[in-house]
């Protein structure tokens, strides 16, 4: 005996008269368009924000540009533990550690510090895993959300650009 070919018979769905002419679908689409038109033109509830003049209010959970925090004495919190670099799924963080010498001991609480700390915003997916992984609370995604620029070099954040200013507010937790 040989192999038997199995044929599956498919019956076509009979379209009704309104399905054939797509009147129902066209009417449904026009109704949605009419609702948006009434909201925008008659009720004056626009969805668009006039950007340069009006700024959008972001929620407290918004993940903006990366910032690095200082402790209460104004020292850098980052101790080059590499937790943020290892957990980053986009591999956007690069850290070079350095030993703390006595001349800069007042700037760093531990025995090593981040000599070079860079975040490539072109690779970053703003997932917030670096913020969660940091045991010292040094990195936060609470900076501005406006990151438009003309050059690619401006989208590579260095430690100096991310570091919180000395004397600024000390924020230890996301508010």
From Swiss-Prot:
The keyword Endoplasmic reticulum does not apply. It catalyses: a quinone + NADH + 5 H(+)(in) = a quinol + NAD(+) + 4 H(+)(out). The keyword Cell membrane applies. Keywords: 4Fe-4S, Cell inner membrane, Cell membrane, Iron, Iron-sulfur, Membrane, Metal-binding, NAD, Quinone, Repeat, Translocase, Ubiquinone. GO terms for biological process: aerobic respiration. Its cofactor is [4Fe-4S] cluster. Residues 69-98, 115-144 form the 4Fe-4S ferredoxin-type domain. It is found in: Cell inner membrane. Belongs to the complex I 23 kDa subunit family. NDH-1 is composed of 14 different subunits. Subunits NuoA, H, J, K, L, M, N constitute the membrane sector of the complex. This is NADH-quinone oxidoreductase subunit I. It comes from Leptospira borgpetersenii serovar Hardjo-bovis (strain JB197). The gene is nuoI.
């Amino acid at each position: 005996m040989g192999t038997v070919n199995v044929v599956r018979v498919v019956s076509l769905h009979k379209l009704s008269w309104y399905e054939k002419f797509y009147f129902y679908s066209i009417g449904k689409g026009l109704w949605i368009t009419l609702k948006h038109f009434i909201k925008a033109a008659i009720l004056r509830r626009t969805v668009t924000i006039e950007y340069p003049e009006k700024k959008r209010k972001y929620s407290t959970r918004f993940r903006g540009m990366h910032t690095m925090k200082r402790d209460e004495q104004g020292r850098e919190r980052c101790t080059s533990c590499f937790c943020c670099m290892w957990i980053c799924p986009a591999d956007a963080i690069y850290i070079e550690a350095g030993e703390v010498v006595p001349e800069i001991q007042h700037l760093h609480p531990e025995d090593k510090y981040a000599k070079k700390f860079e975040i490539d915003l072109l690779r970053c997916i703003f997932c917030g895993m670096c913020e969660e992984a940091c045991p010292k609370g040094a990195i936060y995604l609470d900076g501005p959300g406006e990151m438009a620029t003309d050059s690619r070099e401006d989208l590579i954040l260095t430690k100096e650009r991310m570091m919180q200013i000395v004397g600024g507010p000390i924020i230890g937790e996301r508010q």
